């Protein structure tokens, strides 16, 4: 079952800040992951950020699954993504 990718405003802002080659790499990975998201995802221990994460090199995508949608909550470098703001 293919899942639909939905981006929160925060995730859209996070992506906008990235360099174009990083955006491309993350976009391609998300399309690939949308086929079977739980196969590639890890459950987060702190559900305040979100339920799951994808690892894409040094970048992390924090997301929830709602029905047949992958709701992308945050996108960022691993050194920054888990910091609370």
Sequence positions of predicted segments:
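A short, surface-exposed loop/turn module that caps and links secondary-structure elements
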Residues: 30-54
């Amino acid at each position: 079952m293919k899942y639909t990718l939905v981006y929160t405003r925060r995730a859209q802002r996070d992506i906008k800040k990235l360099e174009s080659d990083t955006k491309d790499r993350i976009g391609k990975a998300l399309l690939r992951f949308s086929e079977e998201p739980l196969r590639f995802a890890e459950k987060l221990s702190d559900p305040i950020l979100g339920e799951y994460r994808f690892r894409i090199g040094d970048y992390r995508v924090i997301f929830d699954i709602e029905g047949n949608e992958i709701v992308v909550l945050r996108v960022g470098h691993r050194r920054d993504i888990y910091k609370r703001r």
